[in-house]
Structures are given as C-alpha cells and as structure tokens.
Amino acid sequence: ANEQDSLTYAAAEKIYARGRMEEAKTSLNKYLQTFPEGAFSLNAHYYLCLIGNEQKNYDMILLHSGKLLEYPNNPFAEEALILRAEVQFNQQNMAEALASYKMLKEKATNVERRQLAETGILRCAFLLRDDIETIHAATDLLAEAKLSPELRNEALYYRAKAYTKQKADKKAMEDYRELAKDTRNSYGAEAKYQVAQSLYDAKEYAAAEKELLNYIEQSTPHAYWLARSFVLLSDVYHATGKDLDARQYLLSLQQNYQGNDDIESMIESRLSKLKVEN
C-alpha cells in the first residue's frame, strides 16, 4: 500500500507541475479518496488549496485549508491560513477571518507574514466594531519597525476612531494630530478637520479658527473635508459673534462646492439659522 500511495501521489503531483490544473484536481482528489490518511495527504490538500486559488474556487480553498489546519504544525499551515483568511475576509465573514489572522500571527515565520496577519486583525476588528481589539491591533502594527506610510496612516486612523468611541478623546487627538500632518491622503484630510472639531467642542474658538485657516491655506485634494472645515469655520464665527463672516463663508462655499452629499443641507440649515437670529 505504501508504494501504491507514493506512486499515486507522485503521478498527481507531476500533472500539477505541468500546470494542468483541472486534471491535477481530479487526480489529487482521487488520491485523497483512495488514501484518506495517506503519507502525502497534507501535500494533496495544500495543492488543492493552490488550485482553488488559481481557479477562484473559494469553497475549495476553505475546504482544503480547513483539512490542513486539523494538523496544527504542518509545513503548509501558514500559506493555508493566508489563503483561508483572505477568502473569509472577502466573503465578509469577519469573525472567522479574525480567528485565521490571529492563528497566522502566532505561526508567522517572517516579518512580512506577521505584518500581513496584524493588518488583517486590525481590519477585521475595525469592521467588527470591536474597539478594544482595534486599539490593540493598531498598536501592535504601529510597533513594527518597517511599516509603509499607508499602513501607518490606516492604523492611526482606525485607532483614533476606536479611541473616540471609547471616550478616550485625548488619545484620539494625538493620533489625529499625527495624521493631520499630511492632508494629501484621505485619513489626514479627515483628521485635520477632526482636530479643529475637537477644539470647537472644547470652546477653544481661537485655536479652532487657527487650525481651520491653516487647513484652508494648506488645502487638500479631498474636497469633502475641506468643505466641512468651511462649515465648521462658520460655526466658530457664529459662536464668537461674527455672523457676517459666518454667512460669507457659507455663501462662498455654496457657490463653489460641487459635491452631491450632506454639505448642501449643512449650509442651508446654518444660513436659515443666521437669518432667524439676525
């Protein structure tokens, strides 16, 4: 049986090596049916994972990666987890993807894979609205020595959002201030606005005005957050008794803003409020 086992497997592997995926799939499945506990069953499940990936057959990936993970310390576990977690994430099974990324983090044998796992954990936690998990995951990722600026921004942004929801406003502000240093990306564009909003909420109107005027001068390709900043600046002027300035900023924004979103209604409600009060 042992010789038969290895011969049957070797034949299937040869077909896979030639790139004949459909044929290899049939042969590998046949091998697993004939030798369910065969000496090469892990290899067969691994190749079937790869074929599933090649053919975008996601059920196949989940099935065979699941079989591989029944043997926790097998040499294919890391790659199986990478494929498995990606499928679960794309199918929006966030809790399952989170579990897979956590396993991957424990098993990761190099920095790239550890970072991939930490990024996955962060995104799943954020989408699951699990603030504590998000904060931990972002902090782990931010501790990585070689982190791309894009991932660093993403981690800071998710952590700031989670801190805000947990009422840790001071910590959220630290992350937003860090992000606000570069308003060219969407995270920084929103962060600069959030910093000013927080100053406004604290009734620090002079500081809020300074932050907003600085933002308007700096500008950003993200028109929505710049428009929100104009609206907030009008709120600052209204709060400090400069209704004429408030009205002017709103009218100028109304004429120049093209976006089809909630900005228009923000302008309208403020203009009618100014009309009633004056």
Question: Which residue stretches match the model-derived regions?
Answer:
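Acidic, polar-rich low-complexity tracts and alpha-helical solenoid repeat scaffolds
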Residues: 1-278
